[in-house]
C-alpha cells in the first residue's frame, strides 16, 4: 500500500509547436494578410487526360446597383441571347463577362482544337446546319456564377432587406400561409336553438343565421351548418390569417440576380480562332460595393462515378473583380469583345452592341 505522496505521477510531455497545424491560406482569416491571394488564382483540373481551365477574356468592371425596387428601365446593355419578356430594370454588369474554356492535353500541354474533324452536314427536315462531330462535346458544359466579397473570402449571395420597403422580390421570398382547416358543423360559443321531442323546430328565414335542428331515432338532435348572407362567415369564426413577417431586422433575399448559369457556345474571337465560350449577359447586383464573381465550370454529362453512385463534378474556378456604383451614377461604357459564329450558315442571329453576331446550335 502506497501513500498518496509516494505514488508516481507521469510528467506530461512538453507541448511542441510541431503538433499545432499552421493556419490554412486557402481562405485567409482576419490575422492572415490579404496579400496571400493564392485562393484567387484560377484553378485548372485534370480529368480524362485533359487539363480544364477558364480564361476571363472580358472582365466585368462596374455596374449600377439595381436595388430592391420595381422600377421599369431599359435594357441598354450588351445582349447576346434572347432575354425573357420582363419589365424589370436589371441594370446588368458591364461589360458582360465573357469566359473562354481552355482544354489542353495533359501530356503535351497543347490546346485541343475544337474544329470539326468532318464537314458540316444538313439535318433532314431542318433549316439548321450543325457540326457532325468534334473532338470536344460541349452539349453538357455549364458555367455557374456566385457572388463573393472583394477579397474572395466569403459568399455574399444573400443580403438582408428591410421590411419597411416592400417590393416584388420580398413578396416572392415570403412563405405562403397554411391552408384553412375544414369548418366543423357546430361552433361552440354560439347559441344553437334545440327543441325537445314532440315540438316541431322553429322555421326561420334561409339566411336568418339560425340553425335548424331535427331529431333522429336515438333522441339526439342533428345540427346543420349555418348559412350567412353574402357567403361570408363572422370574423371570429373564419380561420385566422397568418401574418408574413420579415423578422426583426428584415428578410434575406438574393443579392446576385439574373441568369446565374450559362451554356457553352462555339464562337470565333477577333483572331479568327474557334473556342468554347460562356456569356453572362444578365447579371445584376442589388447592393453597392466591390465584389468578385466565382465562376465554376462543370460537365454534367460526365460518366465518372464515386463508390456511392453520385456523379463527380469537378469545379474550375475563376475570380474576376468589379465594383458597383450608386444607382444614379452612370458608369462609362466600354467596348465589348466581338464574337461571331464559326459558320455563316447559322439560322439564328443576334446583335452584340451594334455588332453582328450569329449563334450555332
Swiss-Prot record:
Disruption phenotype: Shows reduced conidiospore formation but does not affect penicillin production. Residues 1-36, 308-340 are annotated as: Disordered. Keywords: Cytoplasm, Nucleus, Sporulation, Transcription, Transcription regulation. InterPro entries: Velvet, Velvet_dom, Velvet_dom_sf. It is found in: Nucleus; Cytoplasm. Its main location: nucleus. Residues 323-336 have a biased composition (Low complexity). Residues 47-353 form the Velvet domain. GO terms for cellular component: cytoplasm; nucleus. Residues 23-35 have a biased composition (Polar residues). The keyword Metal-binding does not apply. GO terms for biological process: sporulation resulting in formation of a cellular spore. It holds the Pfam family Velvet. PANTHER family: SPORE DEVELOPMENT REGULATOR VOSA (PTHR33572), VELVET COMPLEX SUBUNIT B (PTHR33572:SF3). Belongs to the velvet family. VelB subfamily. Component of the heterotrimeric velvet complex composed of laeA, veA and velB; VeA acting as a bridging protein between laeA and velB. Interacts with velA. Forms a heterodimeric complex with vosA; the formation of the velB-vosA complex is light-dependent. Interacts with vosA. Component of the velvet transcription factor complex that controls sexual/asexual developmental ratio in response to light, promoting sexual development in the darkness while stimulating asexual sporulation under illumination. The velvet complex acts as a global regulator for secondary metabolite gene expression. Component of the velB-VosA heterodimeric complex that plays a dual role in activating genes associated with spore maturation and repressing certain development-associated genes. This is Velvet complex subunit B.
Amino acid at each position: 500500500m502506497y501513500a498518496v505522496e509516494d505514488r508516481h505521477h507521469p510528467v506530461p510531455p512538453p507541448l511542441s509547436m510541431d503538433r499545432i497545424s499552421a493556419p490554412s491560406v486557402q481562405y485567409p482569416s482576419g490575422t492572415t494578410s490579404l496579400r496571400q491571394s493564392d485562393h484567387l488564382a484560377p484553378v485548372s483540373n485534370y480529368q480524362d487526360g485533359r487539363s480544364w481551365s477558364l480564361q476571363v477574356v472580358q472582365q466585368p468592371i462596374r455596374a449600377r446597383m439595381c436595388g430592391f425596387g420595381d422600377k421599369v428601365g431599359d435594357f441598354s446593355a450588351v445582349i447576346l441571347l434572347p432575354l425573357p419578356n420582363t419589365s424589370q430594370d436589371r441594370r446588368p454588369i458591364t461589360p458582360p463577362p465573357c469566359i473562354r474554356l481552355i482544354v489542353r492535353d495533359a501530356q503535351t500541354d497543347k490546346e485541343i482544337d475544337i474544329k470539326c474533324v468532318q464537314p458540316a452536314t444538313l439535318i433532314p427536315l431542318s433549316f439548321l446546319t450543325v457540326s457532325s462531330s468534334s473532338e470536344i462535346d460541349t452539349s453538357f458544359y455549364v458555367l455557374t456564377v456566385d457572388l463573393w466579397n472583394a477579397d474572395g473570402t466569403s459568399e455574399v449571395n444573400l443580403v438582408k432587406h428591410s421590411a419597411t420597403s416592400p417590393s416584388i422580390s420580398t413578396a416572392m421570398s415570403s412563405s405562403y400561409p397554411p391552408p384553412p382547416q375544414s369548418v366543423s358543423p357546430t361552433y361552440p360559443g354560439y347559441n344553437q336553438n334545440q327543441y325537445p321531442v314532440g315540438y316541431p323546430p322553429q322555421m326561420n328565414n334561409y339566411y336568418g343565421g339560425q340553425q335548424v335542428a331535427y331529431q333522429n331515432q336515438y333522441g339526439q338532435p342533428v345540427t346543420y351548418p349555418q348559412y350567412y348572407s353574402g357567403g361570408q362567415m363572422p370574423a371570429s369564426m373564419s380561420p385566422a390569417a397568418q401574418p408574413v413577417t420579415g423578422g426583426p431586422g428584415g428578410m434575406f433575399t438574393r443579392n446576385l440576380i439574373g441568369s446565374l448559369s450559362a451554356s457553352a457556345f462555339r464562337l470565333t474571337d477577333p483572331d479568327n480562332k474557334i473556342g468554347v465560350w460562356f456569356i453572362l449577359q444578365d447579371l445584376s447586383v442589388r447592393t453597392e460595393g466591390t465584389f468578385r464573381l466565382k465562376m465554376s465550370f462543370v460537365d454534367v454529362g460526365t460518366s465518372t462515378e464515386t463508390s456511392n453512385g453520385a456523379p463527380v463534378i469537378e469545379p474550375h474556378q475563376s475570380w474576376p473583380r468589379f465594383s458597383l456604383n450608386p444607382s444614379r451614377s452612370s458608369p462609362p461604357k466600354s467596348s465589348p469583345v466581338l464574337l461571331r459564329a464559326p459558320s455563316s450558315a447559322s439560322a439564328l442571329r443576334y446583335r452584340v452592341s451594334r455588332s453582328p453576331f450569329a449563334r450555332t446550335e
